[in-house]
Amino acid sequence: RSATKNWDWVANSMELAEQGMTYDLGCDEILIGRHASADIRLPDLSVSRYHAMLTVSNGRWTITDIGSKSGVFVNGNLVHEAVLHENDIIKLGNRRLVFRKRRDERVR
């Protein structure tokens, strides 16, 4: 159905943004952390090497704490796992990221 395609488009058109940096969410599983192997690398000692995992399923993005020391906060609430919505504020250590629609809407 077209609804499924629409959800796929929504999932593929999201990004994380912080202080002038943007991170495309171009695959269905994204590791966030300080380690060099992280898909989104945040080189900050307040961020764990393997801090959180972003996954998308049926058009919904979920963030999961994967054993971080400082926790994952969504809109100020400490969570183990949470479904993300547009403009949610994600705090990992001292880093603050916004989950939003991509600013450069490229045609795919």
What is each residue range found by the language model?
Residues I30, L45-S48, S68:
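Loop/turn elements at beta-strand to alpha-helix junctions within RNA-recognition modules
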Residues Q19-M21, A38, G59-R60, S70, ...:
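Short acidic/polar mixed-charge low-complexity motifs
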Residues G67, F73-R108:
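C-terminal boundary/linker segments immediately following FHA domains
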Residues R1-P43, T55, D104-R108:
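Intrinsically disordered, low-complexity acidic Ser/Thr-rich regulatory segments
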Residues L31, R41, T55, R60-T62, ...:
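General beta-strand recognition
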